[in-house]
Amino acid sequence: MRRYSIFAVAREALRYHSGWEKAWASPEPKKRYDVIVVGAGGHGLATAYYLGKVHGIKNVAIIEKGWLGGGNTGRNTTIIRSNYLQDPSAAIYEKARSLYEGLSQDLNYNVMFSPRGLLMLAQSEHEMRGYKRTVYANNLQNVETRWIEPKEVKKLVPILNIAGPRYPVLGALLQEKGGTARHDAVAWGYARACSDMGMDLLQNTEVTGVRTEGGRVVGVDTSRGSIDCGKLAIVVAGHSSVLAGMAGFRLPIESMALQAWVSEPIKPTIDVVVMANLVHGYMSQSDKGELVIGGGTDGFNNYSQRGSWHHVEETTRALIETFPVISRLKMLRQWGGIVDMTGDRSPILSKTPVDGIFVNCGWGTGGFKAIPGSGFAMAELVAKGYSPLAAEFGLHRFKEGQFIDESVAAGVAH
């Protein structure tokens, strides 16, 4: 496949862009693959990519019941950060953030990574103490964060109301290397790279069953026929429990809707990501000028990709007190995705009771920011049976009580 470059853009401009190749192939499924990855979102595609790049396993199929990146990867608010409290969390998220820095060059695809900085506002004494604790922990974890006072917060975000009577800003945790990336580009870049390595991307192919023999996986049944495999990676976010049920085991997760919405485009107003966990809201500005706003999960289990209007009202009302200038903006569109929540708000990257089946799920509200690190660790787990990054995120922790409590760092998810 031809590499993208400024010279390729110039060449295609001269011939009216008629010579671009398809970014990825759409082949018919083969009878057997060494590894089948179910889920062509960011995590599934990254897993396949690092299986090929790092471990040399290229006889891989990525199966997607819909279209590539049509799940949570294309429905999130694109925030990237690694300022987590617990050591295992900080390690995998910082690995992801560092991979994002060079991902455009690695994939030869511009993922539009923008390390614009990220603020987590402390709007109560409790939050202030908690964020200072996180800063101290991050310093020990080699994650660059620092505490800043209200005056510096106001300097970074002039439109912020730091002296509101209900939600005063007492300071903020700042991660200057945090930021955003283009979610579609991340999925498309990984898909293109996987296809270039000879992997098969099977869209509109629903898995209807998992076949096992003697306690080991041997293949899957799909809407396009049966496919044999040596190993199976389940990477389907909110539908992980459905696939696990097909294989005969249960997962300690629950699925909920998480939604986001954007305003009409306005001139550049805010050039950092701002998270206000006390009011369950966060906001950034897109390249097109839209204010991208996210809120909390619905308070009940569901598989709706719409969310509920009361969350829009509650979050917007609280953010207006924090950012009064946005009160007259119109909402342009709203959408939702299905997030998979664990009890300790940390992910699951693990072997399963069925030999040869691996699961990557439970990322909750933090899935997009973890894509490269998650894929790197999952690929190592599938290829070698063990990954240092994934070791503490196994299913065993729920049986043994070795929880990785990230209910505070997860922000809007607790």
Curated annotation (Swiss-Prot):
Where does the record locate the signal sequence feature? none
Q: Where does FAD bind?
A: 42-43, 64, 72, 77, 79, 207, 364, 367, 369
- What is said about its interaction partners and assembly? Heterotetramer composed of subunits alpha (SoxA), beta (SoxB), gamma (SoxG) and delta (SoxD).
Which is a Gene Ontology cellular component entry for this protein?
cytoplasm
Give a short account of what the protein does: In the presence of tetrahydrofolate, catalyzes the oxidative demethylation of sarcosine to yield glycine, 5,10-methylenetetrahydrofolate and hydrogen peroxide. In the absence of tetrahydrofolate, catalyzes the oxidative demethylation of sarcosine to yield glycine, formaldehyde and hydrogen peroxide.
- What keywords are annotated for this sequence in UniProt? Cytoplasm, FAD, Flavoprotein, FMN, Nucleotide-binding, Oxidoreductase
Q: Which organism is it from?
A: Rhodobacter capsulatus (strain ATCC BAA-309 / NBRC 16581 / SB1003)
Report the top EC class in one word. oxidoreductase
Protein name (database record): Sarcosine oxidase subunit beta
**Stored InterPro entries:** FAD-dep_OxRdtase (IPR006076), FAD/NAD-bd_sf (IPR036188), Rhodanese-like_dom (IPR001763), SoxB (IPR006278)
Q: Which residues carry this modification: Tele-8alpha-FMN histidine?
A: 183
Q: How does the cofactor attach, per the note?
A: Binds 1 FAD per subunit.
Task: Tell where it localizes.
Answer: Cytoplasm
- Transmembrane ranges, per UniProt, are none
Q: Which PANTHER family match?
A: FAD-DEPENDENT OXIDOREDUCTASE DOMAIN-CONTAINING PROTEIN 1 (PTHR13847:SF287), SARCOSINE DEHYDROGENASE-RELATED (PTHR13847)
